[in-house]
From Swiss-Prot:
Protein role: NDH-1 shuttles electrons from NADH, via FMN and iron-sulfur (Fe-S) centers, to quinones in the respiratory chain. The immediate electron acceptor for the enzyme in this species is believed to be ubiquinone. Couples the redox reaction to proton translocation (for every two electrons transferred, four hydrogen ions are translocated across the cytoplasmic membrane), and thus conserves the redox energy in a proton gradient. This subunit may bind ubiquinone.
Principal location: membrane
GO molecular function: NADH dehydrogenase activity; oxidoreductase activity, acting on NAD(P)H, quinone or similar compound as acceptor; quinone binding
Record organism: Syntrophotalea carbinolica (strain DSM 2380 / NBRC 103641 / GraBd1)
Subcellular location: Cell inner membrane
Family matches, as PROSITE patterns: COMPLEX1_ND1_2 (PS00668)
Species classification: Bacteria, Pseudomonadati, Thermodesulfobacteriota, Desulfuromonadia, Desulfuromonadales
Full protein name: NADH-quinone oxidoreductase subunit H
Enzyme Commission identifier(s): 7.1.1.-
């Protein structure tokens, strides 16, 4: 078997394993969130379908598939149908460059634990996060509903604003690792994670990805008491389900980005690297759920002021301090 064919087979196998794992993880993350929030609110959460509610994601899938798929009469039909797919597909494509562990030795060759190890993997992730805005904005615009349109506009303004802060937060990481490759960035943290090396950048990035996820306290695009359900007000059936799955896939992507850039990736004692990676990503997801259950929603003016007046200046200051430190160190 020639090398090209073997490489292609390995890529297909890795693609299938990654997609199957992240889709299953996203489904059960919904269940975990409902269980955790139930306990925080002194409720049981879902516990009827299967042992302890373990089959609840399957029941939810069947329910969404059986619901009528309605399209508003005055909606832009094709854009309305395309928007949920954009949100889901951009989240799935992001997993192509995320390294889940150290390379394995298989068939006398090194097998990277990543579908495609790009030299510009970090730029690829940011490009996809920018494209994800279109799914939300187009979904709100195409619905021909004032509530959906306002939700879409809010989401677009929020995501663009906090993407700037997120981009500024990763500059010190790139300066330290001297590479846009996610694998190289993880390997640069073998002795010390970037969370300790760049604590201010870690704080900025953490807040920015919380805003990118559109979850409490940054859930202005879906503020129920103001906008019914925000940008997906007019969606039903599996199209609503695609937005829902896309949200949790995006949560896993953002947790993976935080793990790779600041938490040391797969590095950790005793356990295999992929186990440490999963533990860190799930820890970030639990933090997001905990914040959702305990924090109130910000006002829209507070949200935008915090992004532009606090995070962006802090990000610029952090870049200058990091550059001065690197020059002084030589």
């Amino acid at each position: 078997m020639n090398d090209t064919l073997l490489t292609l087979i390995l890529i297909v196998i890795k693609l299938g394993l990654v997609l199957g794992t992240v889709l299953t993880l996203a489904a059960y993350m919904v269940l975990a969130e409902r269980k955790i929030l139930g306990r925080m609110q002194m409720r049981y959460g879902p516990n009827r379908v299967g042992w302890g509610g373990m089959l609840q994601p399957l029941a939810d899938l069947i329910k969404l598939l059986c619901k009528e798929d309605l399209i508003p009469q005055r909606a832009d039909r094709w854009v309305f149908m395309l928007a949920p797919a954009i949100s889901t597909i951009t989240a799935l494509l992001a997993f192509a460059v995320i390294p889940f562990g150290a390379p394995l030795q298989l068939f006398d060759r090194s097998l990277p634990m990543v579908i495609c190890d790009l030299n510009i993997g970090l730029l690829y992730l940011f490009a996809l996060s920018s494209l994800a805005v279109y799914g939300v904005a187009l979904g709100g615009w195409a619905s021909h509903s004032k509530y959906a349109l306002l939700g879409g506009l809010r989401a677009m303004a929020q995501m663009i604003s906090y993407e700037l802060a997120m981009g500024l937060a990763i500059v010190p990481v790139v300066m330290t690792a001297r590479s846009f490759s996610l694998t190289a960035i993880v390997e640069a943290q073998q002795s010390l994670p970037n969370m300790l090396r760049h604590p201010l950048a870690f704080f900025i990035f953490l807040v920015a990805i919380m805003a990118e996820s559109k979850r409490t306290p940054f859930d202005m695009p879906e503020a129920e008491n103001e906008l019914v359900a925000g940008f997906h007000t007019e969606y039903s059936g599996m199209r609503f389900g695609m937005f829902f799955v896309g949200e949790y896939l995006n949560l896993i992507v953002l947790g993976s980005m935080l793990t790779v850039l600041f938490l040391g990736g797969w590095y950790g004692p005793l356990l295999p690297g992929i186990c440490w990676f999963l533990i860190k990503v799930l820890g970030v997801a639990f933090f997001f759920i905990w914040v959702r259950g305990t924090m109130p929603r910000l006002r829209y003016d507070q949200l935008m002021a915090f992004g532009w007046k606090i995070l962006v200046p802090l990000g610029l200051l952090n870049i200058l301090v990091t550059a001065a430190w690197l020059i002084w160190r030589g």
